[in-house]
């Protein structure tokens, strides 16, 4: 079986699926009886956009309801169920980073370090992209492996690298709601408003995942509330469409503070 792509352009051919909004915080389903992939969706498809009796002309219009998914497979993570389970020694640097296997990751980096490099920092591997352009740091950020992220950053991993479809460590950490990792990356001066091929920004991903603390952290560091994704959604539009009241309240409070700061102190006279 060919490995599932890490990022897929899922433009619906017939009708867009309706996302499960009952448990918005749980964006990952690793149950082997359901699927061998982990799919993280960005943009919602509202119920009125789904018409089971839609004809061919309507189907073409539904292409505007673009669903951006990042698919991270169990095979790529090295935990695929098989007759011959993978050992840690057989995993790639990307799989080790995704699983947070720090000891093995360090050994892997040392073995691949440049012979002329006395610090053995593994510079020729630490920013190595996989077939989709994902670096070890991007993988670790996507799966919330904060100690691995901290280690990779300390060893010189570049947090500014973008994958082939402009996915970033910050966007994937925001998508997963990994607020501490988001802060670590922002401390390295990454672009807080970086956008991917679909116009998705870290703030849009955090809102889509209903990650309140992550939204707060991004807003506190200056994330742009006015940016629109290619679907036409702003962060506020997205929160309203999905019924995420707490996220909406956080953004409303932020807007109010910005407005008050522009007015300055009120003269009592």
From Swiss-Prot:
Pfam families: Ank (PF00023), Ank_2 (PF12796). PROSITE patterns: ANK_REP_REGION, ANK_REPEAT. GO terms for molecular function: DNA-binding transcription activator activity, RNA polymerase II-specific; histone deacetylase binding; RNA polymerase II transcription regulatory region sequence-specific DNA binding. ANK repeats lie at residues 88-127, 132-161, 165-194, 198-227, 231-260. GO terms for cellular component: cytoplasm; cytosol; intercellular bridge; nucleoplasm; nucleus; RNA polymerase II transcription regulator complex. Keywords: Activator, ANK repeat, Cytoplasm, DNA-binding, Nucleus, Phosphoprotein, Repeat, Transcription, Transcription regulation. It is found in: Cytoplasm; Nucleus. Expressed primarily in thymus, lung and testis. Interacts with RAF-1 via its C-terminal ankyrin repeat domain. The same domain also mediates its homodimerization. The third ankyrin repeat is required for association with the two other RFX subunits; RFX5 and RFXAP. The three central ANK repeats mediate binding to the PxLPxI/L motif of RFX5. Activates transcription from class II MHC promoters. Activation requires the activity of the MHC class II transactivator/CIITA. May regulate other genes in the cell. RFX binds the X1 box of MHC-II promoters. May also potentiate the activation of RAF1. Forms homodimers. The RFX heterotetrameric complex consists of 2 molecules of RFX5 and one each of RFXAP and RFX-B/RFXANK; with each subunit representing a separate complementation group. Interacts (via ankyrin repeats) with RFX5 (via PxLPxI/L motif); the interaction is direct. RFX forms cooperative DNA binding complexes with X2BP and CBF/NF-Y. RFX associates with CIITA to form an active transcriptional complex. Interacts with RAF1. Interacts with RFX7. This is DNA-binding protein RFXANK.
